[in-house]
Curated annotation (Swiss-Prot):
InterPro entries: HMG_box_dom, HMG_box_dom_sf, TOX_HMG-box_domain. It holds the Pfam family HMG_box. This is TOX high mobility group box family member 3. CDD domains: HMG-box_TOX-like (cd21995). Keywords: Activator, Apoptosis, DNA-binding, Nucleus, Transcription, Transcription regulation. It comes from Rattus norvegicus (Rat).
Amino acid sequence: MDVRFYPAAAGDPAGLDFAQCLGYYGYSKLGNNNYMNMAEANNAFFAASEQTFHTPSLGDEEFEIPPITPPPESDPTLGMPDVLLPFQTLSDPLPSQGNEFTPQFPPQSLDLPSITISRNLVEQDGVLHSNGLHMDQSHTQVSQYRQDPSLVMRSIVHMTDAARSGIMPPAQLTTINQSQLSAQLGLNLGGASVPHTSPSPPASKSATPSPSSSINEEDADETNRAVGEKRTAPDSGKKPKTPKKKKKKDPNEPQKPVSAYALFFRDTQAAIKGQNPNATFGEVSKIVASMWDSLGEEQKQVYKRKTEAAKKEYLKALAAYRASLVSKAAAESAEAQTIRSVQQTLASTNLTSSLLLNTSLSQHGTVPASPQTLPQSLPRSIAPKPLTMRLPMSQIVTSVTIAANMPSNIGAPLISSMGTTMVGSVSSTQVSPSVQTQQHQLQLQQQQQQQQQQMQQMQHQQLQQHQMHQQIQQQMQQQHFQHHMQQHLQQQQQQHLQQQISQQQLQQQLQQHLQLQQQLQHMQHQSQPSPRQHSPVTSQITSPIPAIGSPQPASQQHQPQIQSQTQTQVLPQVSIF
């Protein structure tokens, strides 16, 4: 709670009556300009007292300051029975625990904030003693103000109305800050701060308070509404989630190839639909799956080969598509660079022409302060942009804006310093149409040159693209040729292996045949007759031998025939390989 006192002029007498004493603290340098005045309706707000209040060291002066008493309960205008304003008396500094009364008096020539009182002094319960005086302040009165803050507001408003109507004398008005009063009384207006405007400074010339400082029940209702709106504001602040937009596919992009099963499904779907027109997609897919499972590996390989061929074509098309995208990006970047270069050249020409004019003007001094107008016979030529152009006599013609207040004695030295013929007289201020046409023609020529350069760049880019396509095609052809050569080499290697295997088989057959011949020869050696013995038994036995051995030549003849046949069978087989 801040109670502000404003001292009067220096040299006031020490002995003052009550009105003068209160006027000393209630008046400022400019007179009665207090705000948020509190008064009583019956002019009995303050009561004189015999006790004196000793201020801190301001000399030997002593001032009588009466205590501030609450309004009587019998006031019919307030309409608030059993309610007392909890204002305490201003007493000497008390040595209480942590409750310090620290007055601060400014110099008499300045309006600075003065006395500051601790909050605990206002909220203390019990009896406050001050030089023999005491005032009872019960806990129930403070709790009533905390429970019903609107009554406090009504009392304050009523007191300000009474002060306006002139019931109280101006010497009995005291300034009290409204926000600090409500904070020290422990008011809780629905969890929100009471909106109030800053009071008028003490230097104002009117003694009546501002109407914005009065607070009533409607202000409290408005604060409650504002709190409700603030609570609902975060809910409404939530932004709805925007769905992500899908990127549109480029129609020129090649489509991915389909699998072998998808190709088989396309081929068989129409036939199944023709046989079963009422079949659903799920039933058709089941039938196709069963048919795919029942297919042989050779039939499946046919569809797989088709998919592989489609994949190769897709890779080729994708490479070409990406190359085209790269070329387009390069073309766009080249166009942007050309546009930037043109803009930079135009800006540089404008800067150079303006710099030439500025340097020439700075060399010949500043323009005098007194404005001088050109003769009426000299017309003004205004050009939007300064341009430099080459004339046959190597003269630089720049567009100059001649103002009405420019002195006429600048033209000759400016022309002599630049070494060029500039527009300064009747004949030179007006640009001839031939010069304008020449400028226009130069601009057209520049534009044509730029277009030609752009066309050349585009053609060069197209050639590069064509070369890139050719290189890609050559690479693909080389890869295809290499693949074909690898397949051919593999086939040749397989054939060579087969030949080697067949030769090994023939060699094995020959070895077997030789072994058979050796076995036959061995058998023949074993079958040959042993030497004859001179005995009757041998004669008897040998007699039938010729009969038995007679068929041996036939068997020997048969063996060469078998050998000749086997040789004739082996020779044609060897000739084949």
